[in-house]
């Protein structure tokens, strides 16, 4: 069952996103201890794990999340999400159609990336629990990212559909969250702001403060 508070501090990470002196297990556990509300396993890039290695890691990270009662979401990979019985899946505009995914994930969380009004107009949101809007700011984490849309895009979507849960993504750090919250976002999703933080507990707590009112 989806709760929009899951979106408050949404951590996204894969093996290529963590510094060389840490493992993804260490980074995730530190983030979980600090109080992230949702985790998405996003294994991308040239060095990304594949096949059984990816499956094994996904199971380990899923187990870690469940120890802290945090839902585990898989990015894009429908077969992996089904195989490990993930708590949900997040897809982009170029990935499998949401309607097709929904038949496999009737009781799971489904998220969809939307960057602009055109994508919003052509997206079927019938089975979608939340949308990820961005990039809000310039981001180094996604080389294929769109042009930054700014917090204004969140405000526009909220005006069009006030009940639609929205999580912001792209270039977000603890210094630029306020305009996102003011625009009406239900949460923020970050990669490097947490994965490369020198003090994960402090970073997560600062993010949480914006949504604890």
Curated annotation (Swiss-Prot):
GO terms for molecular function: magnesium ion binding; thiamine-phosphate diphosphorylase activity. Its EC number is 2.5.1.3. Binds 1 Mg(2+) ion per subunit. The keyword Cell membrane does not apply. The keyword tRNA processing does not apply. Keywords: Magnesium, Metal-binding, Thiamine biosynthesis, Transferase. GO terms for cellular component: cytoplasm. Mg(2+) binds at residues 76, 95. Condenses 4-methyl-5-(beta-hydroxyethyl)thiazole monophosphate (THZ-P) and 2-methyl-4-amino-5-hydroxymethyl pyrimidine pyrophosphate (HMP-PP) to form thiamine monophosphate (TMP). Belongs to the thiamine-phosphate synthase family. This is Thiamine-phosphate synthase. The lineage of its organism: Bacteria, Bacillati, Bacillota, Bacilli, Bacillales.
């Amino acid at each position: 069952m989806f709760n929009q508070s899951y979106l408050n501090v949404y951590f996204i990470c894969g093996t290529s996103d963590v510094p060389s002196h840490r493992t993804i297990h260490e980074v995730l556990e530190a983030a979980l201890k600090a109080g992230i509300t949702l985790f998405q396993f996003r294994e991308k890039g040239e060095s990304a794990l594949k096949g059984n290695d990816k499956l094994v890691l996904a199971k380990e990270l899923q187990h870690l999340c469940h120890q802290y009662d945090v839902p585990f979401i898989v990015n894009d990979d429908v077969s992996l999400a089904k195989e490990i019985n993930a708590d949900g899946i997040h897809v982009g505009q170029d990935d499998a159609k949401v309607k097709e995914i929904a038949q496999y994930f009737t009781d799971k969380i489904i998220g969809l990336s939307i960057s602009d009004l055109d994508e919003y107009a052509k997206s079927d949101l019938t089975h979608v629990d939340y949308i990820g809007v961005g990039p809000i700011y310039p981001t180094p984490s996604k080389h294929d990212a769109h042009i930054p849309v700014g917090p204004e895009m969140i405000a526009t979507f909220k005006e069009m559909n006030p009940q639609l849960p929205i999580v912001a993504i792209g270039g977000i750090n603890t210094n630029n969250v306020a305009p996102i919250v003011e625009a009406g976002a239900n949460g923020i999703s970050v990669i490097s702001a947490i994965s490369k933080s020198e003090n994960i507990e402090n970073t997560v707590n600062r993010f949480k403060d914006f949504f604890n009112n």
